[in-house]
Curated annotation (Swiss-Prot):
One of its GO terms (biological process) is 7-methylguanosine mRNA capping. The gene is PB2. InterPro entries: Flu_PB2_2nd (IPR049110), Flu_PB2_6th (IPR049114), Flu_PB2_C (IPR049115), Flu_PB2_CAP-bd (IPR048298), Flu_PB2_middle (IPR049111), Flu_PB2_N (IPR049106), INV_PB2 (IPR001591), PB2_helical (IPR049113). One of its GO terms (molecular function) is RNA binding. This is Polymerase basic protein 2. The keyword Methyltransferase does not apply. Belongs to the influenza viruses PB2 family. It is found in: Virion; Host nucleus; Host mitochondrion. It comes from the Viruses. A motif (Nuclear localization signal) lies at residues 736-739.
Length: 759
């Protein structure tokens, strides 16, 4: 009060008023304002006040050589007075106008490259289609979404290194560009931005937009890929939505989508192999998505989906601490529980051993089409508030929550036996047994659950066992809400462990994920997925298995041939022959294998019966565990194209056709590759030509190591000896000649020598 009186008193004196209104603000005030590092309290006032001055801008001295002192109207553009406290010139806003009209014009060629993300956005919007506006209640839930279409997926640190390398290549500082994507981007950008005159800082900001994924936690109803998020403000309000089809796709959305499909295929395939974890890792490491190694994408891409997270866990990467059940992501928001094993009886009197969670807990459940809040105690559902896009989605959420609650009335609602199996034909664990059972038909479950009268609460409504809404009654504890439940925003990642059956656990031993949680939904990937692993051959059906198996043999023929003669058992056990077995009728697999192995043994024993084409053709059949029998076959059956097709033991067939003239193999009419060596028997001449420059010393001598193929001989030094595998599948010892003169006679003597050495 006192101070206000004092101020009033001062203001009543005319001298005070004069001082405050007439005196110019000295530069000290401005310097103080600049240098005291406080947040600007009134930016708009400050701006107006600065711009009201004659020279609000300071510029480098060089500006005086580039801009005249006065413009055409005779107005002063810069002051001869130096800016106090710096050696810069004070400049009028009119100088900016002059520069824009008369300043030098630089090349605009770099603009579209620097502002790439903006130019692309304009194109997408130009070609996008906006549909009708619908007025309806919007169930929005906050989700972590990608707000920056068209970016690469580098981490902030990786991007920083790339930007420094591109924009400030000569700056000091350790920069290590390791990942493939970093190197590719750096090279590409350096080329694009040669002679670029745009300010480096601006270039750096724009590059950041292009390289790093930016996510925000936004309320969304509808599409969550980045090309939808960029028009979120145009497509959904509080009570309306506008239909929109993007005018283009961006690679980051395609990568996310294709990654999910690849991960699902790999987890499903690994789950049925003998060692799921090893198989999964082998497949992740040998798969490419859109030309980039899948493991590189997994390291950089933050997509959270069950299969993707299983792959990440296998690679030792951190994943989200929420767990998955019935396709919903559960996040505990309060409470705690301990686990205890308990035996329970189903309505069919089948005994189930379930791990009961004892204690009060609250969860958020987030699925693709429905969300819920669940409060539960030990084997009791207290409250479930669901919201979903349609009735079907709401049913799914209720079933999952009821099973998860482990209530007795749910277990007693089971009719019939529970014997669901996974893809590897192993019984599912009890909780998933119950889930599958009620997902098939929830009628009894809902009927047995019980109903209760409800209070009228804003935005909530009851739901009856037959899924009709009601304001009077509802299934016990269950309510349907108009509002969605937000996804869990915390993006913390935790260290997890994974066992060989691909069950992922947190450090307290709670199972977060298992292959049962991986969706069976099939989609078509946007980017090409290349699975190099033989385990994925069957993804495109039996024909692909057949073609891929033979392609593999032909590609690796040099090593296969040596193993065939020296270590056949190891060859038969190769995992590349595993998928082929599913094509051979089960009842006869063993006989085929025994027959082919015997045939091969005869080839090894009897000189001159080595037949490349026949070995390639029959080899996959030898991989099954053999049954000894006297049976002979003239053709072998494989199940492709919905029926049994025959492969002739001698000669060509539609399934396996080798053209001697072109040396091309076609399998079911598809090209399976070219044989690089002549598989015809009567051609000892080929060997003799190849062995020119080598002396044949006699039979194989194990002291000189494993047999080399003819192609590998060229590496020998003069006078060096080695065993070599020749066309008939026999091994002889040779020495590289010390002199070149006698080479001509080699080819004539080679043929005789080979015969002698073998006999």
């Amino acid at each position: 009060m006192e101070r206000i009186k004092e101020l009033r008193n001062l203001m009543s004196q005319s001298r005070t008023r004069e001082i405050l209104t007439k005196t110019t603000v000295d530069h000290m005030a401005i310097i103080k304002k600049y240098t005291s590092g406080r947040q600007e309290k009134n930016p708009s006032l400050r701006m107006k006040w600065m711009m009201a001055m004659k020279y609000p801008i300071t510029a480098d001295k060089r500006i005086t050589e580039m801009i005249p002192e006065r413009n055409e109207q005779g107005q002063t553009l810069w002051s001869k007075m130096n800016d106090a406290g710096s050696d810069r010139v004070m400049v009028s806003p009119l100088a900016v106008t002059w520069w824009n009209r008369n300043g030098p014009v630089t090349s605009t060629v770099h603009y579209p490259k620097i502002y790439k993300t903006y130019f692309e956005k304009v194109e997408r919007l130009k070609h996008g289609t906006f549909g009708p506006v619908h007025f309806r209640n919007q169930v929005k839930i906050r989700r972590r979404v990608d707000i920056n279409p068209g970016h690469a997926d580098l981490s902030a640190k990786e991007a920083q290194d790339v930007i420094m390398e591109v924009v400030f290549p000569n700056e000091v500082g350790a920069r290590i560009l390791t990942s493939e994507s970093q190197l590719t981007i750096t090279k590409e950008k350096k080329e694009e931005l040669q002679n670029c005159k745009i300010s480096p800082l601006l270039v750096a900001y724009m590059l950041e937009r292009e390289l790093v994924r930016k996510t925000r936690f936004l309320p969304v109803a509808g599409g969550t890929s980045s090309v939808y998020i960029e028009v979120l403000h145009l497509t959904q309000g509080t009570c309306w939505e506008q239909m929109y089809t993007p005018g283009g796709e961006v690679r980051n959305d395609d990568v996310d989508q294709s990654l999910i499909i690849a991960a699902r295929n790999i987890v499903r395939r690994a789950a049925v192999s003998a060692d799921p974890l090893a198989s999964l890792l082998e497949m992740c490491h040998s798969t490419q998505i859109g030309g980039t190694r899948m493991v590189d994408i997994l390291r950089q891409n933050p997509t959270e989906e069950q299969a993707v997270d299983i792959c990440k866990a296998a690679m030792g990467l951190r994943i989200s601490s929420s767990f998955s059940f019935g396709g919903f992501t559960f996040k505990r928001t309060s409470g705690s529980s301990v686990k205890r094993e308990e035996e329970v009886l189903t309505g069919n009197l089948q005994t189930l051993k379930i791990k009961v969670h004892e204690g009060y807990e609250e969860f958020t459940m987030v699925g693709k089409r429905a969300t819920a809040i669940l409060r539960k105690a030990t084997r009791r559902l207290i409250q479930l508030i669901v919201s979903g896009r349609d009735e079907q989605s709401i049913v799914e959420a209720i079933v999952v929550a009821m099973v998860f609650s482990q209530e007795d009335c749910m277990i007693k609602a089971v009719r019939g036996d529970l014997n669901f199996v996974n893809r590897a034909n192993q019984r599912l664990n009890p909780m998933h047994q119950l889930l599958r059972h009620f997902q098939k038909d929830a009628k009894v479950l809902f009927q047995n659950w019980g109903i209760e009268p409800i209070d009228n609460v804003m935005g909530m409504i009851g739901i009856l066992p037959d899924m009709t809404p009601s304001t009077e009654m509802s299934m016990r504890g269950v309510r349907v809400s108009k509002m969605g439940v937000d996804e869990y925003s915390n993006a913390e990642r935790v260290v997890v462990s994974i066992d060989r059956f691909l069950r992922v656990r947190d450090q307290r031993g709670n199972v977060l994920l298992s292959p049962e949680e991986v969706s069976e939904t099939q989609g078509t990937e946007k980017l090409t997925i290349t699975y190099s692993s033989s385990m994925m051959w069957e993804i495109n059906g039996p024909e692909s298995v057949l073609v891929n198996t033979y392609q593999w043999i032909i590609r690796n023929w040099e090593t296969v041939k040596i193993q065939w003669s020296q270590n056949p058992t190891m060859l038969y056990n190769k995992m590349e022959f595993e998928p082929f077995q599913s094509l051979v009728p089960k009842a006869i697999r063993g006989q085929y294998s025994g027959f082919v192995r015997t045939l091969f043994q005869q080839m090894r024993d009897v000189l001159g019966t080595f037949d490349t084409t026949q070995i390639i053709k029959l080899l996959p059949f030898a991989a099954a565990p053999p049954k000894q029998s006297r049976m002979q076959f003239s053709s072998l059956t494989v199940n492709v194209r919905g029926s049994g097709m025959r492969i002739l033991v001698r000669g060509n067939s539609p399934v396996f056709n080798y053209n001697k003239t072109t040396k091309r193999l076609t399998v079911l009419g598809k090209d399976a590759g070219t044989l690089t060596e002549d598989p015809d028997e009567g051609t000892a001449g080929v060997e003799s030509a190849v062995l020119r420059g080598f002396l044949i010393l006699g039979k194989e001598d194990r002291r000189y190591g494993p047999a080399l193929s003819i192609n590998e001989l060229s590496n020998l030094a003069k006078g060096e000896k080695a065993n070599v595998l020749i066309g008939q599948g026999d091994v002889v010892l040779v020495m590289k000649r010390k002199r070149d003169s006698s080479i001509l006679t080699d080819s004539q003597t080679a043929t005789k020598r080979i015969r002698m050495a073998i006999n």
